[in-house]
Amino acid sequence: RIVKLGDDMISLAADEDGQFSHIGIVVRKGNDWMVVHAVPGEPEFKGDSDRVKMEPITSFFCSEKAKSGAVMRVKADSTVCCSAARRAKALYHKRVLFDHTYDLQDSTRMYCTELIEYVYRLEKVDISGGKLTAIHIPGFNGNFLLPGDMFQSKKLTMIYQY
């Protein structure tokens, strides 16, 4: 699992106490390390939808997108983590759309933390422990699962942070 801090004003406003504003899962594609994540506003081609995407880890962490970042490992058997990564890749291949309503109850569309929580819950691992953050900003009210909520999870071990 990877987290990063970008400069998205909505993410920073929503997660002002959090250290990170985005999250993805590391997967292997041939000999390359990639990150699968759900993201709006980063089309790969003209007319591309906001959706789950897969990109090289270097692109995910490039300075234009990330001011800081971390690589964390889920405290689970490696077969569980590999299966979660395969599930994330499958969502990418299905071209699952980005969830602009941030609805955790609807898995037909995904936002970044929802994607990670979803693939690990299918493996019977509850990373967030049900932790949600209450957000009350104009036009955006409710309880949401933010990267900062997951960053605090006892089920994660820090591997590297910058």
Where are these regions (language model features)?
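Glycine-rich catalytic cores of cysteine/serine-nucleophile enzymes that process amide/ester linkages
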Residues: I2-R73, L97-S107
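Short beta-strand-to-coil "C-cap" segments at the C-terminal boundary of structured domains/repeats
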Residues: R73-A76, Y162
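Sec-exported extracytoplasmic/periplasmic mature domains
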Residues: R28, P40, A76, K89-H93, ...
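Activation targets extended, charge/polar-rich intrinsically disordered C-terminal tails
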Residues: H100-Y162
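N-terminal targeting signals for Sec/Tat export/insertion, comprising classic cleavable signal peptides
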Residues: R1-K4, S153-K155
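Stable alpha-helical elements in mature extracytoplasmic
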Residues: V80-A88, T108, C112-L115
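Residue-level detector of flexible, active-site-proximal loop/helix-junction positions
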Residues: E42, S78, A134
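Membrane-interfacial terminal anchoring regions of lipid-handling membrane enzymes
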Residues: C81, L91, R95-V96
